[in-house]
Curated annotation (Swiss-Prot):
Coiled coil: none annotated. The lineage of its organism: Bacteria, Pseudomonadati, Pseudomonadota, Gammaproteobacteria, Alteromonadales. NCBIfam families: PRK02101.1-1, PRK02101.1-3. PANTHER family: PEROXIDE STRESS RESISTANCE PROTEIN YAAA (PTHR30283:SF4), PEROXIDE STRESS RESPONSE PROTEIN YAAA (PTHR30283). One of its GO terms (cellular component) is cytosol. This is UPF0246 protein Sbal223_3241. It comes from Shewanella baltica (strain OS223). It comes from the Bacteria.
Length: 257
């Protein structure tokens, strides 16, 4: 199985990584193109474009200015340890074994507005550039047009290398929109997580994000290879619901917390 997840806005570049093993992102030339565009933006432009505070806009203007593509462990960090946030809390990479971290390198891919498609051990420098940002660039009016078919092709290549034909989409809609499902050369599965609130099952963003991270970890640590094995996911009180599921959207429910 090849797993797709979103990145996180929250970053941790303070704690040292748990391994000295790393790889370099595949699309740094593309990243450099975007950085050149972003460097034309004033902090005020960034605040408006990204809908962030002046403080965060200033921070990211500085990050764009400092960014350079010669990554090492001195100035960058592996993506799986740099990203924090709900999905990554659920995934809990810090407690994986060395073998499991190695497994994530072939089985997990992180969609990114700046870096395109990251392997877990790819080095990144701090940034904020969400996939849904309407950043005008030489290839179009937003990042979806910038990346075009590039990320879909990269997912197909990663899928072929993984030896599986199942893609488990645990990314948000914003990020998965960068992929063209009809061009994927495998079976696409997009799990849904619903929590019971006031007697009704619904997707609650905070819980769903954590559940996505937990499922990504579950696939890695349990060596899940089939849809039947995926349906056995039962962490944090979730259970598979045949009634609420469709062939491409296995649905997991949890009672009120």
């Amino acid at each position: 199985m090849l797993i797709l997840v979103s990145p996180a806005k929250t970053l941790d570049f303070e704690q040292p990584p748990l391994t000295q093993v790393y790889s370099q992102p595949d699309f740094l030339t593309h990243s450099q193109e975007l950085i050149q565009v972003c460097r034309q933006l004033t902090p005020s432009d960034i605040a408006t474009l990204m809908k962030v505070s002046d403080k965060i806009a200033g921070l990211n203007a500085a990050r764009f200015g400092e960014w350079q593509p010669d990554f090492s462990l001195d100035n960058a960090k592996q993506a799986i340890f740099a990203f924090r946030g709900d999905v990554y809390t659920g995934f809990d990479a810090d407690s994986l074994s060395e073998d499991e971290i190695a497994q994530t390198q072939s089985q997990l891919r992180i969609l990114s507005g700046l870096y395109g498609l990251l392997r877990p051990l790819d080095l990144i420098m701090p940034y904020r550039l969400e996939m849904g940002t309407a950043l005008s660039n030489p290839k179009g009016k937003n990042l979806y047009e910038f990346w075009g078919d590039t990320l879909t092709q990269a997912v197909n290549e990663a899928l072929a290398e993984s030896g599986s034909d199942i893609i488990v989409n645990l990314a948000s809609n914003e990020y998965f929109k960068a992929i063209k499902p009809k061009k994927l050369q495998g079976q696409l599965i997009s799990p849904v997580f619903k929590d019971c609130k006031n007697g009704q099952y619904k997707v609650i963003s905070f819980f769903a994000k954590r559940a996505r991270g937990m499922m990504a970890r579950y696939i890695i640590t349990n060596k899940v290879n089939t849809l039947a094995e995926l349906k056995a996911f039962n962490l944090a009180g979730y259970y598979y619901s045949e009634e609420q599921s469709s062939p491409t959207n296995p649905t997991f429910l949890r009672e009120e917390q």
